Regions:
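Alpha-helical interaction segments
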Residues: 5-6, 115, 415-418
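Secreted/extracellular small peptides and ectodomain modules produced from precursors
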Residues: 13, 57-59, 399, 414
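Sequence context of c-type cytochrome heme-c attachment sites
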Residues: 375-447
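Residue-level detector of transmembrane insertion/anchoring sites
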Residues: 6-8, 35, 41, 410
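Acidic, metal/ion-coordinating pockets
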Residues: 15-390, 419
């Protein structure tokens, strides 16, 4: 079965290798990327992920699961021919320590993520602390299996046993020279062996200057420094253009809309690979700074969502106040506030206009069930689950699960049916009634 798994990975490589206009090359090399036919207009897309932490697809615990590398592959293939993929750090492993029970499973997933990201056109993967969960030697092994473009300007390898970690990359994406560098907080690498960490703002300032001298027209920083750290970095080093900050907003809360901090665009893409950020670069023959942010209506949507939350909160207050005659004036004012907010929401939200020349449009793309899985990457995941089944079966003696006369037995739902026929009939109509069959049909009952 391991052969099937490796064959599936090889198939992905054979079908997708070298199709990206941003294939991996040594530091200092600028690619001849796909260019537009109009020399006065250059358009390219950058896709970004933040805090994937080893998730190759959603766990399936929610009614509308988000995420999955097979969906990410589809989104990228539907995008512009000139595109590249970036990650802001902590791609491979969870932030919490691995257990002996799940270690091998996480290693399998890390190998999938490294290979799939590479074949989807990843041109820079910022080094996060959890990426070094198995040590620097493991990352070097991944690079031997297939080039993995690690980047960090302030986390540097020690000795020769670790992976190659570039301080920055210069890429040609759709005729646009994109400089990419990565940083992380030194304290997040405290106790991590094989690397040395230095202060990141100084490293960014020096590296962006080098990228400019080499011809970078736009400089993107993959910064695993938190929200405040990203805002401070934008103020401290205004010479950069874009910060992709991590960690992203935890799942269950919508990712923050993009914003401008001074002249710098700051954005994130959530967590666990549930979304991808899409940056559409649209420039003329020259790039004029500061680069404008086109948020594709995200700020307007956030304002409308805030207004809706306020209405619900105000109505809750009204319910508590209306029985109190001493609060009549407050009730009237609150009703007026609700009416004004409802008036704002009644007006249709303006549709985003054409993207202006000289701007970066930032959109958050949710990887929903509506996005069909890419068949090649789906085959890789199917091989992974088959390998995982064999792996977990090999860990124990299945004979210990055999029935014995003295041991309690599992009777199943049929034993409930005779006493509770109506409840049983209702249960059979729910998703709970076919939960195990669902797991089996997707080969996930050993996950």
């Amino acid at each position: 079965m391991k052969g099937i798994f490796l064959t599936a990975l090889a198939l992905t490589a054979a079908c997708q290798a070298d199709k990206s206009p941003s294939a991996l090359l040594p530091v200092g090399t600028v690619l001849a990327g796909a260019t537009t036919t109009n020399p006065t207009e250059r358009v390219a897309e950058l896709y970004v992920s933040t805090e994937v932490v080893g998730f190759i697809e959603p766990c399936g615990c929610t009614s509308k699961p988000l995420g999955g590398v097979q969906r990410l592959a589809t989104v990228l293939k539907r995008g512009r021919p000139a595109h590249a993929l970036l990650d802001a750090g902590n791609l491979l492993f969870p932030a919490e320590p691995l257990t002996d029970t799940t270690r091998e499973q996480h290693v399998l997933k890390a190998r999938i993520l490294a290979r799939v990201y590479r074949q989807l056109g990843a041109v820079a993967i910022n080094l996060g602390p959890s990426d070094l969960t198995l040590g620097a030697a493991f990352l070097k092994e991944l690079q031997r299996e297939g080039a993995v473009p690690w980047v960090s300007s302030n986390i540097r390898p020690l000795g020769e046993d670790g992976p190659a970690i570039a301080q920055s990359f210069l890429r040609d994406v759709g005729g646009i020279h994109v400089g990419v560098l990565g940083v992380a907080t030194p304290e997040s690498f405290a106790g991590v062996k094989g690397v040395a960490a230095i202060e990141y703002a100084t490293a960014v300032r020096a590296e962006q200057a080098l990228l400019r001298r080499r011809g970078a027209e736009i400089v993107v920083v993959l910064a695993r420094v938190g929200e405040k750290g990203a805002d401070d970095l934008a103020r401290d080093v205004p010479e950069i253009d874009v910060i992709v900050r991590a960690p992203g907003t935890p799942i269950g809360t919508p990712p923050a809309p993009p914003k401008k901090v001074g002249s710098v665009i700051v954005l994130e893409a959530g967590s666990q690979g549930q979304h991808t950020g899409r940056l559409t670069l649209r420039f003329g023959a020259q790039v004029t700074r500061p680069i404008a942010l086109d948020d594709a209506g995200a700020d307007q949507a956030a304002r409308r969502a805030l207004a809706d939350r306020k209405i619900r909160a105000f109505r809750t207050e009204l319910d508590a106040w209306q029985a109190d005659p001493t609060k009549a004036d407050a009730v009237a004012k609150k009703r007026a506030q609700i009416a004004e907010l409802e008036k704002q929401l009644a007006a249709p939200a303006p549709a985003p206009g054409p993207q202006p020349l000289g701007s970066v449009r930032v959109e958050l793309v949710p990887l929903t069930e509506d996005v069909p899985p890419d068949p090649i990457v789906a085959d890789v995941l199917a091989a992974y689950y088959a390998e995982l089944k064999n792996l977990n079966l090999s860990k124990g003696d299945v004979r210990l699960c055999a029935k014995t006369a003295a041991a309690p037995t599992y009777v199943g739902t049929e034993a409930c049916k005779s006493c509770h026929p109506q409840a049983y009939a209702l249960w059979k109509t729910t998703k709970h009634g076919k939960a195990w069959a669902t797991l089996e049909s997707q080969n996930k009952h050993f996950d």
